[in-house]
Design a protein with these regions (language model features):
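Residues on the lipid-exposed face of transmembrane beta-strands in outer-membrane beta-barrel proteins
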Residues: 107-113, 169-173, 197-201, 241-245, ...
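Repeated loop/turn-to-beta-strand initiation elements of outer-membrane beta-barrel proteins
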Residues: 117-122, 176-181, 206-211, 248-256, ...
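Transmembrane beta-barrel strands of outer-membrane/channel proteins
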Residues: 86-92, 123-127, 183-187, 197, ...
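Transmembrane beta-barrel architecture of outer-membrane proteins
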Residues: 104-106, 164-166, 192-194, 236-240, ...
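Outer-membrane beta-barrel translocator/channel fold
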Residues: 130-160, 212-248, 258-266, 274, ...
């Protein structure tokens, strides 16, 4: 909202006579989120200052995103279609039976290229600096388990010094009336490649939303960095129906519940609860229970974890939406594992939240 205030001030400095309303439409990854309408006369009074005791409320409202008509005058922010950045990466797991603290430290180089306003191609190359996953000795599932090893080959993947983490194409589209969609395909994460789609319904300034995603993926080979561009024989259909809820009595809390099929073919649900603080820091936890029995799952019985997400603008001199996430997963096992998609529509449409600030 500070961005809206700054934009309004800039527009007012060069505003032609006779303009009654300023409309500012926010976009994220070229998806229109929301249009903020501000009455010029009201804004002018606020900028000039009002007499003490005679202050009025700024005449401003949020509406569904609008595209300027041909008869309207407008401006837009011109951004480069190509972007490249390098980021530090720390993956970690706490409390495992093999070693209490396991980590992987590296750097990730990412290149993004917008082919069109809706089609994004993106790829990331990971360089491994240090890790202690040689102590991850989980090589055989429980004898009575029928779960395929969808995550416990992690040691084999991270022993490669440099590898393509993801290389994919995403097509994003605003479908109107609060609906958003995306389709994607390629190497979607370290361990899986394939194709999928997601649709989200998120009414403006609502405290709830619903989404569904469906994917067909194959497991990437782990024997070498070159082999990671190939696939094993294992493939699976995975997807979830997800509900998002910000309780009216605790609007800084997000409750996320999903049901569907996981990477090992097991079916069940995940409950995630996260708390956002005034600083922007988010602390959350999750648990997943599926039809895989505790004996099939192995030590730990079910998948669970906690995480902390920190906005990087706390440490930056300029505004940024980037965040750093630190997660703790007590055990890495094969049951209840979701596909690690790079883009999720709910996070991409945060400007539509009733709590957006």
């Amino acid at each position: 909202r500070e961005g809206i205030e700054r934009a309004n001030r800039i527009v007012m400095n060069d505003l032609p006579d006779g303009i009654r309303t300023i409309r500012i439409t926010e976009n994220r990854l070229n998806l229109p989120q929301v249009t903020t309408e501000t009455e010029v006369s009201s804004l002018k009074r606020h900028l000039e200052g009002e007499p003490l005791g005679h202050e009025t409320q700024l005449a401003q409202k949020r509406v569904e995103p609008m595209v300027p008509k041909t008869t309207e005058q407008g401006w837009y922010i011109d951004k480069s279609r190509f972007d490249f950045h390098i980021d530090p990466v720390l993956n970690q797991s706490v409390g495992g039976p093999e070693n209490f603290y396991m980590y992987q430290l590296g750097v990730m180089g990412t290149a993004d290229w917008w082919v069109t306003d809706h089609l994004l191609t993106t790829g990331s190359l990971f360089a491994n600096l240090a890790n202690n996953y040689d102590k991850f000795n989980y090589t055989n599932p429980p004898q009575d388990s029928h779960l395929p090893r969808v995550r416990t080959h992690v040691r084999d993947y991270v022993q490669n010094d440099v590898y393509v983490n993801n290389l994919q194409a995403n097509y994003f589209q605003s479908l109107g009336n609060g609906f958003y969609g995306q389709v994607y395909g390629g190497y979607l994460e370290t361990m899986y490649g394939g194709a999928g789609a997601e649709v989200l319904y998120r009414p403006l300034d609502s405290n709830w939303a619903f989404g569904v995603d469906a994917n067909y993926v194959k497991q990437r080979d782990w024997r070498s960095a070159q082999d990671m561009m190939k696939f094993t024989d294992y493939s699976v259909k995975t997807g979830h129906l997800t509900a998002y809820w910000n309780p009216s009595f605790a609007q800084d809390v997000l409750v996320k519940a999903s049901v569907g099929q996981y990477l090992a073919g097991d079916k069940g649900g995940t409950l995630e609860i996260a708390k956002r603080f005034d600083s922007g820091v988010v602390v959350g936890g999750y648990a997943t229970i599926t039809n895989a029995s505790p004996d099939e799952y192995g030590e730990g019985d079910f998948t669970k974890g906690v995480y902390v997400s920190v906005p990087l603008d706390l440490f930056s001199s300029g505004p940024t939406r980037s965040r750093a996430a630190i997660g703790w997963t007590p055990l890495t096992r094969d049951g209840g594992q979701q596909l690690g998609r790079k883009f999720g529509l709910y996070d991409m449409t945060s400007d539509r939240s009733v709590n957006f600030r």
